[in-house]
Design a protein with these regions (language model features):
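Bacterial N-terminal signal peptides that target proteins for export
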Residues: 1-11
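C-terminal motif of bacterial Sec signal peptides marking the signal peptidase cleavage site
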Residues: 18-21
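Beta-strand-rich domain onsets/edges
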Residues: 23-56, 60-62, 66, 103
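Short amphipathic beta-strand segments in non-cytosolic proteins
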Residues: 74-90
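Residue-level recognition of secondary-structure-to-loop junctions
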Residues: 93, 105-107
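Aromatic sugar-binding surface patches on proteins
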Residues: 94-100
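Short acidic/polar inter-strand loop motif in beta-rich domains
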Residues: 118-126
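Short beta-strand edge segments in extracellular beta-sheet folds
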Residues: 130-135
């Protein structure tokens, strides 16, 4: 009869050691940069988490390095697994090539943030950034 309590105790100890490793770690700020369509698009998501977030995008001209302040930016955050489409939101120009985008992450998981950037007189550009949202 002593064997069953020992097996149960061993199971509890094993779970106590394994479960903390399954938790989502605190996510550091996500920063990334891509050059596409004559623009450099830099993302800073400042510790993405479940709930409301503000993503900051900086857009500069790839050739002149000057800020692009006249772009129209829309964004969609799509959950990867399970694949769920997100709601499209618009970026707000803050001046000097800086745009803020309100994004809501429903759960702690990986998302693809798809940005559509349109400058007057230019072809539209689509950029995708992976973002890991924490709890």
């Amino acid at each position: 009869m002593l064997l069953r309590p020992l097996n149960f105790l061993s199971l509890l100890v094993a779970l106590g050691l394994l479960l903390p490793g399954c938790a989502h770690p605190h996510t550091a700020p996500a920063t990334a940069q891509q050059t596409l369509g004559g623009m450099v698009v830099a993302l800073n998501s400042n510790s993405p988490h479940t709930g409301d977030n503000t993503i900051t995008i900086t857009v500069t001209d790839a050739n002149t390095k000057s800020p692009v302040g006249n772009a129209n930016i829309t964004a969609t955050a799509e959950m990867i697994s399970p694949r769920l489409p997100g709601t499209q939101v618009s970026g707000r120009a803050q001046g000097n090539g800086l745009y803020s985008i309100p994004v809501r992450f429903g759960v702690a998981t990986r998302y693809h943030l798809t940005l559509h950037i349109q400058r007057p007189g230019q072809s539209s550009v689509t950029v995708v950034f992976p973002i890991d949202a924490a709890e």
